[in-house]
A protein has these predicted regions:
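Short, conserved "active-site rim" segments that organize catalytic pockets and cofactor/ligand binding
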Residues: 7-27, 95
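Structured catalytic cores of enzymes that bind and process phosphorylated ligands/cofactors
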Residues: 2, 14, 40-44
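N-terminal glycine-/serine-/threonine-rich phosphate-binding loop
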Residues: 26-36
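Glycine-rich phosphate- or other oxyanion-binding loops that anchor nucleotides, phosphorylated ligands
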Residues: 7-9, 34-239
């Protein structure tokens, strides 16, 4: 990618490869490299596009977003991916456009820049912890939290520190308190978001009755990733 310092670049930031995959397909992004940074790149409506996978959690999100912004002259950062619901009624695949993203550790609130229309509402809660306790999640819901994620506030912190507008498109892939995800399932992925194949195989051998649940979870994740990517592409396509 030989024009990484030109203005007008839109950067997509995903935590996991499965969140990036729909963007690659919808935007025909190709593999590229900027220095030692591996990216996907393309164009849309006169904009240069670049996309990265950071890995899961706030530390990796902050580090990799910083590396991207060091390497590329970015006009806007767009976070794209999945998020967990804090109730048991929100349909899987529902698009979440938060008014505010909260860092669960510092309490700092970040406001996404408007991008592509939509009606933002509620708070997204960024935490490195897997939250499944019913009372804890109910407390967050009472404070206006509508979904949980593990990276967005960290990306926002880096962007705002550099004066770069950022937006977020996430969609519901699971529900925090319905039993679909627990610590064991959570750790079936590496921190870079790729599946831990041996761990998955061992889990399914120990719990064959849970295979249908895992299939449903996988379908929900795929649906959410597709929804979030489609919304991000629509926003980028608008004049």
């Amino acid at each position: 990618m030989d024009n990484s310092r030109k203005p007008g670049v839109i950067a997509f930031v995903c935590a996991m490869p499965m969140e990036l995959r729909p963007l690659v397909r919808k935007l025909s992004l190709h593999k590229s490299q900027i220095g030692d940074l591996r990216v996907r790149a393309g164009t849309l409506g006169g904009h240069q596009l670049v996309a990265i996978v950071t890995g899961m959690g706030t530390r990796l999100a902050k580090t990799e977003t910083g590396r991207l912004l060091d390497a590329v002259g970015v006009q806007r950062v767009v976070v794209v991916g999945i998020t967990g619901a804090v109730d048991n009624t929100t349909p899987i695949g529902t698009l979440v456009l938060p008014e505010v993203v909260v860092d669960s550790v510092s309490g700092v609130e970040y406001r996404p820049a408007p991008f592509g229309g939509g009606s933002p509402h509620g708070k997204m809660w960024t935490t490195d912890l897997l939250l499944t306790d019913t009372d804890e999640v109910a407390g967050l819901r009472a404070r206006g939290v509508v979904s949980l994620d593990m990276e967005t506030a960290a990306v926002a912190e880096v962007c705002e520190g550099r004066g770069i507008p950022w937006s977020v498109f996430r969609a519901i892939s699971d529900r925090a308190t319905d039993g679909s995800i627990d610590e064991e399932i959570f750790h079936l992925s590496h921190r870079d978001g790729t599946p831990n194949g041996p761990a998955v195989a061992r889990y399914l051998l120990r719990h064959p009755a849970l295979i249908p649940r895992m299939v449903r979870l996988g379908r929900g994740v795929t649906r959410a990733a597709e929804t979030a990517a489609a919304a991000a592409v629509r926003a980028c396509s608008q004049p």
